[in-house]
């Protein structure tokens, strides 16, 4: 505002000089008569100004009298409105949280009113008729929506008038500087002067007002009785009032008519009672700032008319407020300006001169040409406008008539003109005309002349109406506010009335359209009725035969005979009708039979496939039988056999050679492998396969072979060969049709096509014909033989009759002849057989070719997907496996998991998820899951949301899927497909999110970093794109451009086969270039560049794939150029921007961020959860060496790291120190190694450690109490007094105050109340190794006893059963014999016992029952009783003996793992006659890596079982790991087990052992079962190094270092393998969300190095014996 005002003043001055120049120049050219007329006009103007001043004085006197009456009603109205406001706050407070402030409604109202969005939202909501719902459990953003929705509902029902005006912001708006009123007073006093100097002073005072009145202070009462203030710009205040006036009008119309679109009429609302409205109603304030003009009423007559309806006033109110306003007989503020046109112009100019505060606000002008004397009364709020506060609030333009118009000189006129030009920024006027009831906005130009005497109110109204009608297109301005409220300098602005006109016009159009629609509907209904009627008529006609007698003319014969031709015609028509009906019935029957056949074919598809396989086996058997017969032929017929075998070999060679590199030759005569290369097929995502045609080269080879074989065959078999050739050509023609076969079900079994059935029928017919021909030939041969025999017999009889004497001689000859004839017959039969065999062989060869082709087609149909390097036998075995019931169950469960993955829900139990290992190792189930998962992700990928709560569940499922895939023996198509689909699920909201997850998977599994595996994925993507674009053109590319899928085929030979054909087909297809560029650049270059591959490999791979993309030459060149440029950019950026192998493109992902310290990338999906922090885990917990160096440099630097000037040193500064510590605490901190700067730098961490130390020591003290009580009861309470003193000292607590003081200046103390932890002597589990560190600890005294807080922390969830349910009634003293003490647990001591009946050793744990520990005991017994696992200690029974419980467990002979881990003790032998003590060398008995892997594996199995039952052990350490003679490893001591229920998935109680506890447990944060994983990592470090990390430090110092720095590195990392170090680092991850669970760790490669149980048992026995021998040599001298 302050910047704009000088410019406006300068513009005003320049315009005023122009006006003066324009006025003076015509005076020289005017005639004397015209000059006299001008002087007369000036005199008249002066007289009118004097009259106006007199009227203003009278009005001021009347207003002063009215103000006294108004104050009575203001308080009542304000109190009423405040009650309404409180009710609104209560209503919203119930829906929202209690954290809302008292003034949230006012703030939201002020912000929305200032921006002008309320009116827009209201109009849109009234148009649409929708209001958003209220959120019952809102967050911060939803809370704001609740407030806005409630306000919108108030505006919609006309209730906002109850709310706007009681607001404390709007009622208490005051001017920031009170000096402005004084300046205005000085201006009014100087107005009556006639000198030019006084006029100049007036202008200066007005300019001062411009600079000071730019802001207003808004005050609101507070709860405590104070006042909240807020400064508001006057521009916003003005917008607020304009919005209020417009919304009040709308609300009143909604209240009266139900819609603001209807205009109010005189009959709709009764006018209020008339009140005399004299000149006393003027609000011109010359000497008093409390009375201001709110409305400027310009009239051409002397009287003013009242508005016909209350809605035309600038501020409308609801009925409740109108009732109160009618009772209050108050007058409306009005002004009278009874002057001519010139006087009106001068008055406007002078008003603008004194209202420079409102330079950027519109003016309200009410013009009424008719004359009436009554005005409606306004409510008390409107009368309150007379106050000074509401004056500065409302910003409705004021008409101060304290002007400089009394001057008679020309200079005064010039000054008036100057004032005119100074205030040309008053651009907008809202004019309300009473007679027409129209509201319009008139744009006042900056260069208009105010001396136009011919302008009238009628012309103004007509002009404004024309402008409003013409400009109705744009409703909103550039800044988003409505043009009604905007103050832009556009002369074509739209008025509010024109806006309503347009809405009414649209409403009329909509009503007309509705009428036309209804009429059209009626016509449609009538037409439908007519159609139904006609249909019924046609049915009747069809049902009844047509009688043509009525339509045929009869003859003139008196007998009535009909001609024969006509009778025949009628009969034919009747026959045609019957035939048509029969045809209809036959068609229906055929359709039913076809459906029935299709269903039967689908059901019997498996049987048909089996029949085909059996037929092929029969053919093989026949061929083998024929080969055996051919091998047994004689040597004379070898040539014909060799010819047939040659044909067979040639056919086999052609079948084996046609397959290219991927074919496999068979040893037998008939090859069952797929000889042809796999066709160019679609991806699995399209759920169909395209059958490829046979190559023309192969066809020619087969035809040549058949022609060669035909030359050796006889003539009578030529027909069969021709039939075979015809059948083969029909197969080729059928395969060339590119017919697609869709999958009928998830099992991938298809129905047999009609072509195959026809081929089978043809083959059967050919076989039948051949058999018939063979039978006929055999019959003919037999007949010939019979005839020959008969002829011979006749000849013999004749010879016998004639030559009886020569019989003996001839008999010998005859016998010889008969032998010769028999030999000839045999030879003829053999020749016939050979010919038949040749025919059969040739037929079998043609049949083999046909069968091979049929097998290829059937394999393409039967196999739902082509698997790389897989034969038909594998496919058949998979189909047989899929038929079993076990696979069906597994597939159903896989579908259930798929639905859980997609919907991100928790309806799958965690115990069932472990079945996935069996599912995904099976290839058939993996294939079915992949198909279902792809179909579901296509449909629901963008619709279903991803919850943050269920994100971990989906990640867990995906991790198990990937781990199972990684462990699978073969890397097939479906395993890679599952990786892509799971990454798509995790990143469903992102377009290119799949690449990110693949990069992470390849980092974790480097064996998959091979381009050969992924080459076919990318090639399949190109095929999919090619088929999409070639089928639908470039129009479909826009729809598929957003999703980038990287799928793949399986065999590399497919790419080589298709590249040969790509050159021929590249010119036939037009592919969208941009779509392929996106897929190549994003999914190829960016993905492969981050795998750590070389630049040349990525470049060659992408260019080779781009050449196979079916592009034209020009587009291919462009594509290769872009690929090379992106490769160059991605690899050059690694040296400058990127840290590591990642490319610069990764910055485009939202989840990926960069650490502020080490400048490494933080991955969003690393297998666990997404992180949005800008600090990596190592820098957060200061585990990086670089971070530690930076931290040390920052803490010990001489000067702070700030901007210039550098090296600033403060001689006097404020220091921090801890005061008020007792001596025990000081000694504890000193012994723990804490220094002052560490405490100052890490105050919260120190407090967390001290709290944890106190709670842990309290727990230890309670256990020591139980142990001492048990020992005292067994030893007859010998040391009761000492125990009581120890208990009194241990139960005392100290309330510590850390006073942070200013050492030298302020001496202010900040009290931090904290309960000091008490220090116990037995707080370390490694007292044998650390006696020097722990013996000097002191227990400080504690004056107060406040155990309630820590008792609540130690509480375990209340069990649902009692102790009686767990304890048996037998007497344990009779059953067991108690022996020596073995050790102690968390709740009591452990003894060795023996069963008196069986003699079996058991472990007996005696626990004292008390009110404090009964819950812990019940929890321990119940968990042990319900836990049955090989790695969990076995529960036998439990008994109650007085106030003790005996817990009987199995006995582990080698005890705990602690005794076997640490170094051998330095044994010192003491005898009576020996010398002084001599130290022996230490003998180290560390476990090797295989033994550590075995222990970790066994412990993880037990932990996994416990975690599956939703429980956490919380005390995993070497003391609680027991060992048996058979090498068994079992978890014991369930005293601190916590149940994780659905209501309480995390815990925050402090339990466990300090050195084995996780950082989140030490800090007091919530934790879950991941705490046990941390303890396992510490156990692994203890097994490798002999002691846990920080064991040499005191407990407090160790806890402090664990929370800050984590676990240190290995002492000797070269001694251990990388798998072991990785395993330990995973367990000891500081971020519990990134820490894996037990099920994931069981699949780690380190555990595969575990030894056998026998080897571990031998090692344990060796260590046990050595330690036993060492202890046996010890002799004690007392």
UniProtKB/Swiss-Prot annotation:
One of its GO terms (cellular component) is cytoplasm. One of its GO terms (biological process) is aggregation involved in sorocarp development. A zinc finger (Phorbol-ester/DAG-type) spans 1141-1197. Its EC number is 2.7.11.1. Keywords: ATP-binding, Coiled coil, Kinase, Magnesium, Metal-binding, Nucleotide-binding, Serine/threonine-protein kinase, Transferase, Zinc, Zinc-finger. GO terms for molecular function: ATP binding; chemorepellent activity; protein serine kinase activity; protein serine/threonine kinase activity; zinc ion binding. Residues 1-15, 35-73, 180-214, 276-359, 399-428, 631-654, 662-671, 695-713 have a biased composition (Low complexity). Pfam families: C1_1, PBD, Pkinase. It catalyses: L-seryl-[protein] + ATP = O-phospho-L-seryl-[protein] + ADP + H(+); L-threonyl-[protein] + ATP = O-phospho-L-threonyl-[protein] + ADP + H(+). ATP binds at residues 1382-1390, 1405. Residues 1-73, 180-224, 262-428, 442-489, 631-672, 693-722, 1267-1292, 1323-1346 are annotated as: Disordered. Its cofactor is Mg(2+). Residues 1376-1647 form the Protein kinase domain. Residues 1202-1215 form the CRIB domain. Residues 17-34, 215-224 have a biased composition (Polar residues). The keyword Coiled coil applies. The active site is at 1515 (proton acceptor). Residues 460-472 have a biased composition (Acidic residues). Residues 512-542, 570-628, 752-862, 1269-1309 form a coiled coil. Residues 82-189 form the Calponin-homology (CH) domain. The keyword ATP-binding applies. It is an enzyme of class 2 (transferase). Belongs to the protein kinase superfamily. STE Ser/Thr protein kinase family. STE20 subfamily. This is Serine/threonine-protein kinase pakD. It comes from Dictyostelium discoideum. The lineage of its organism: Eukaryota, Amoebozoa, Evosea, Eumycetozoa, Dictyostelia.
